[in-house]
């Protein structure tokens, strides 16, 4: 059995390197090694929906990993049968003494779910029904880096900050629902996540769920396909706090709006806290049902505007300190003066300054700052002004021409590094130049899954901040797409 556990740990370690943190937790946190007989490893899943999705998305890759690690004859089987789980858990001969003691302790102690999440690879645990119940509502999308303590307060966001902190301390009391609105990169997600983290700290018994509107939509669509809508409704209507990010992504999508309407009513009637974010006021949402818009305005609506000069300087100084770089005050002030868009762009400018210092071993002067700012402004213009004007075929033509690829390369399943990289870039550009969802982008790129597309987008986004070569390539491709 121990060998089986070790093999499963190898699989988890390999997959974790290939997925974003969010993807890994959402698909693998609730999986448990339960048995290894001969060359067959059994892994428990929380429900049939989860089982089907893991098999569909990862079975092929798991087999490839087993072959790579020299375990080609091993088979991994995912199960969710409660009878089989009970049979296994009652057979003490298959359960080590440590596991039996662990299960007995669970009857008298509340398990620390956070510890489980961190130790999922190093300490794969024996499956137990009690443990599954506790973990069911743990939110993998709450990131501990977002706190009220490291949120920089200014006149543009003070009201939103105070309201968010009040909600975390007294959920479901004063401001329910609450909607925070404002442009991209101004700190809406930071506040939303901070609410979740602070509430989790103060109200440990609360079932809190943070989710983006896109993931909410994708999960709803999957639940329809797999006939699991009851599970979906139960998940979202039995929460203590729902944190729904970017509700503007639900425009023109009537089915999910209907579902959100009923979810809203169920939570509101039970005095459960809801917080939403949006890039505009509810009244400005297009193709959104009036009754749902009226629900959003039932509580508190608070905006976050662009940071003023003083706040921009504070943000830049904090980011520079976090990144461990020393930049003259006049350079930081120059960045603050010229980058007036949002917090995300300010932090991106500091990241690029660090890259120049680390990779080129040069001192930063005004010429380098001007170059960096031009890149950021060019990207911002591309991102905000062209989504509806760029033809998908134009994006594809530029990718194929500039990267010297064929249709078969970009839409196939080749694992060659240069082709895989090109597909990541293709997904990233489609996301930035169009309003296509990740599911729609996946269909264009040879039938890739939502998770695969999301991984590609996140990877290029991260690489742009760390790798000057990648960043310059993306800017060059963007410019050629605009001219094409």
Swiss-Prot record:
Binding site residues for ATP: 185, 187-189
Single GO MF annotation: ATP hydrolysis activity
Cell compartment(s), UniProt: Cytoplasm
Annotated region (Domain II), positions in chain: 73-140
Region (Domain IV, binds dsDNA): 358-484
Source taxon at top rank: Bacteria
Residue numbers spanned by region Domain I, interacts with DnaA modulators: 1-73
The family this protein is said to belong to: Belongs to the DnaA family.
Domain comment quoted from the record: Domain I is involved in oligomerization and binding regulators, domain II is flexibile and of varying length in different bacteria, domain III forms the AAA+ region, while domain IV binds dsDNA.
Name of the protein this chain belongs to: Chromosomal replication initiator protein DnaA
Organism expressing this protein natively: Borrelia recurrentis (strain A1)
Gene (name only): dnaA
């Amino acid at each position: 059995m121990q060998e089986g556990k070790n093999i499963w740990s190898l699989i988890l370690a390999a997959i974790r390197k290939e997925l974003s943190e969010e993807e890994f937790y959402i698909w693998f946190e609730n999986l448990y090694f339960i048995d290894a007989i001969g060359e067959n490893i059994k892994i428990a899943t929380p429900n049939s929906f989860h089982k089907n999705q893991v098999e569909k998305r990862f079975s092929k890759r798991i087999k490839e990993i087993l072959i790579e690690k020299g375990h080609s004859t091993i088979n991994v089987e995912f199960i969710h049968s409660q009878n089989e789980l009970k049979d296994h858990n009652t057979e003490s001969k298959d359960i080590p003494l440590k596991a039996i003691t662990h299960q007995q302790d669970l009857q008298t102690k509340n398990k620390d779910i956070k510890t489980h999440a961190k130790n999922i690879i190093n300490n794969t645990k024996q499956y137990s029904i009690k443990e599954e119940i506790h973990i069911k509502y743990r939110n993998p999308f709450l990131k501990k880096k977002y706190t009220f303590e490291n949120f920089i307060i200014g006149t543009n966001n003070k009201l939103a900050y105070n309201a968010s902190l009040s909600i975390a301390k007294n959920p479901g009391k004063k401001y329910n629902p609450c909607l925070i609105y404002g442009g991209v990169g101004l700190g809406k997600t930071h506040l939303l996540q901070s609410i979740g983290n602070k509430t989790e700290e103060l109200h440990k018994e609360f079932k809190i769920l943070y989710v983006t509107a896109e993931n909410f939509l994708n999960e709803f669509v999957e639940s329809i396909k797999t006939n699991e809508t009851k599970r979906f409704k139960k998940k979202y209507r039995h929460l203590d706090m729902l944190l729904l990010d970017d509700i503007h992504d639900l425009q023109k999508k009537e089915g999910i709006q209907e579902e959100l309407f009923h979810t809203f009513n169920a939570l509101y009637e039970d005095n459960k806290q809801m917080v939403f974010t949006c890039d505009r006021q509810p009244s400005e949402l297009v193709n959104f049902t009036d009754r749902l818009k009226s629900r959003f305005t039932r509580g508190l609506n608070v905006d976050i505007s662009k940071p003023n000069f003083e706040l921009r300087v504070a943000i830049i100084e904090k980011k520079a300190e976090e990144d461990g770089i020393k930049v003259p005050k006049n350079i930081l002030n120059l960045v603050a003066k010229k980058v007036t868009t949002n917090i995300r762009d300010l932090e991106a400018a500091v990241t690029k300054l660090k890259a120049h210092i680390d990779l080129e071993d040069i001192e930063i002067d005004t010429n380098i700052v001007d170059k960096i700012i031009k890149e950021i402004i060019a990207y911002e213009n591309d991102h905000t002004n062209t989504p509806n004007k760029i033809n998908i075929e134009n994006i594809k033509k530029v990718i194929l021409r500039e990267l010297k690829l064929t249709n078969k390369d970009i839409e196939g399943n080749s694992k060659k590094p240069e082709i895989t990289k090109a597909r990541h870039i293709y997904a990233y550009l489609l996301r930035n130049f169009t309003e296509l969802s990740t599911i729609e982008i996946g269909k264009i790129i040879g039938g890739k899954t939502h998770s695969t597309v999301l991984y590609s987008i996140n990877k290029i986004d991260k690489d742009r901040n760390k790798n000057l070569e990648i960043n310059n390539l993306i800017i060059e491709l963007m410019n050629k797409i605009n001219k094409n």
